[in-house]
């Protein structure tokens, strides 16, 4: 049997992995500016954590979950999204306690799992970066979080992004709209896709989100949620829109956008960009004020978003965006002769301990092959260390781009290479 990765997964290898590290590091830097701290939750949860919060009737739960019974007969699922595990952790660890600063701001990043048809930018094991903010029902929190997502997408280089905005109102507004939608769609039931006929019975708002042609035609003249907002819901949505305008964040009202998870209320949003004629959602989220209490905590407001790393990288690639990744070696040591082996090891270690990215030859190859390796590694400087250099204690350090050389002692390299590095035209951090 040929051993290979499971369908819908990938090996992320160098140099591709450097792009992942850059995106993750960039996200951490942006989130830190907004006072978010990292939280790490298990990749598997009790089945009920996901099914009850995401919604028993959602596609995630009915079709896409990886769930199983473990050896203790506990019903376990691999996490298909990030919000429910973070909320479970928030409640379990009593982060709602008075001594914990509010609002509480967390971010996460890591693998998620859904059993769906693998395609470009969508895998069965995929990676998500997300944020969750607890304890503020202020519409300014909605806007700050949306603005943070916009800030991240703009600075990382995504082009042509449009913010789609909607509201689901409070539970009362949503219930009134739900009934109006049922009344509108029931006479059209036979024209809907099989999935949407099922959704009409279980969660009619999801019909609005369908990508099927017949469903899109059916909802073209459907009632709008904006006509069913009560005073509180309308005031919240108006405030969100006004503050976005104050910050100069453009948006499009999209009343057919409902998001695929049942826990949202009030503001929901998606950042969408067009790639090769197709609209791709790069980041999405919204408000979920009832989820913490649903998990057994006190009534607590919540707001967050998630974005898929695979999709983000796909969009950057399609848009021709090159991430500023530093791959170059600072120093490469070419080693000539067995007598130089130990000194080369001491030297490369001393360079690394001074903060330089350094490598040496270990394969006893001809110098020409070692110089080629230095070029492949885009080494800034090159040291050739043979037995005669070890005996004399002197060595030549070459700028591998300009070919400029300086003669220095091995002791200087071991103790103060930054002086030589700068003399050859490079600058240390």
UniProtKB/Swiss-Prot annotation:
Catalytic activity field: tRNA(His) + L-histidine + ATP = L-histidyl-tRNA(His) + AMP + diphosphate + H(+)
Localisation per UniProt entry: Cytoplasm
GO cellular component: cytoplasm
Broad EC category: ligase
GO MF annotation: an example: ATP binding
E.C. code: 6.1.1.21
Keywords: Aminoacyl-tRNA synthetase, ATP-binding, Cytoplasm, Ligase, Nucleotide-binding, Protein biosynthesis
Any one Gene Ontology BP term: histidyl-tRNA aminoacylation
Main location: cytoplasm
InterPro entries for the chain: aa-tRNA-synth_II, aa-tRNA-synth_II/BPL/LPL, Anticodon-bd, Anticodon-bd_dom_sf, His-tRNA-ligase, HisRS-like_core, HisRS/HisZ, HisRS_anticodon
Quaternary structure and interacting proteins, as annotated: Homodimer.
Family assignment from sequence similarity: Belongs to the class-II aminoacyl-tRNA synthetase family.
UniProt protein name: Histidine--tRNA ligase
Organism from which the protein derives: Streptococcus pneumoniae (strain CGSP14)
Lineage: Bacteria, Bacillati, Bacillota, Bacilli, Lactobacillales
């Amino acid at each position: 049997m040929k051993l290979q990765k499971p369908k819908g997964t990938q090996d992320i290898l160098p140099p591709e992995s450097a792009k992942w590290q850059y995106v993750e590091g960039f996200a951490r830097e942006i989130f830190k500016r907004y006072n978010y701290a990292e939280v790490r939750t298990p990749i598997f949860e009790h089945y009920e954590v996901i099914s009850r919060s995401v919604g028993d009737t959602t596609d995630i739960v009915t079709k896409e979950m990886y769930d199983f019974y473990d050896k203790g007969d506990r019903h376990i699922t691999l996490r298909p999204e990030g919000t429910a595990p973070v909320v479970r952790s928030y409640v379990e660890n009593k982060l709602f306690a008075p001594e914990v600063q509010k609002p509480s701001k967390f971010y996460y990043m890591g693998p998620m799992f859904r059993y769906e048809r693998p395609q470009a930018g969508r895998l069965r094991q995929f990676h998500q970066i997300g944020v969750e903010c607890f304890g503020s029902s202020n519409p300014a929190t909605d806007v700050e979080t949306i603005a943070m997502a916009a800030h991240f997408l703009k600075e990382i280089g995504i082009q042509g992004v449009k913010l789609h905005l909607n509201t689901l109102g409070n539970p009362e507004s949503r219930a009134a709209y739900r009934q109006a939608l049922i009344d509108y769609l029931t006479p059209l039931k036979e024209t809907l896709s099989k999935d949407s006929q099922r959704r009409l019975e279980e969660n009619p708002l999801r019909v609005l989100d369908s990508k099927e042609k017949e469903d899109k035609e059916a909802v073209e003249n459907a009632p709008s949620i904006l006509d069913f907002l009560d005073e509180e819901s309308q005031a919240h949505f108006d405030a969100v829109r006004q503050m976005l305008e104050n910050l100069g964040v453009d948006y499009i009202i999209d009343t057919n956008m409902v998001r695929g998870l049942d826990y949202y209320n009030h503001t929901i949003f998606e950042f969408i960009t067009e790639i090769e004629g197709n609209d791709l959602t790069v980041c999405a989220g919204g408000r979920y004020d009832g989820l913490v209490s649903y998990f057994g905590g006190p009534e607590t407001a919540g707001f967050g978003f998630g974005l898929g790393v695979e999709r983000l990288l796909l969009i950057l690639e399609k848009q021709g965006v090159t991430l500023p990744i530093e791959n170059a070696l600072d120093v490469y040591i070419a080693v000539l002769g067995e007598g130089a082996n130990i000194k080369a090891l001491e030297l490369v270690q001393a360079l690394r301990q001074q903060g330089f990215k350094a490598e040496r030859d270990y394969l006893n190859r001809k110098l020409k092959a070692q110089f080629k390796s230095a070029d492949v590694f885009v080494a800034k400087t090159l040291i050739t260390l043979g037995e005669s250099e070890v005996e004399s204690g002197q060595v030549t350090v070459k700028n591998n781009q300009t070919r400029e050389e300086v003669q220095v002692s091995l002791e200087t390299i071991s103790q103060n290479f930054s002086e030589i590095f700068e003399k050859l035209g490079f600058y240390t951090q």
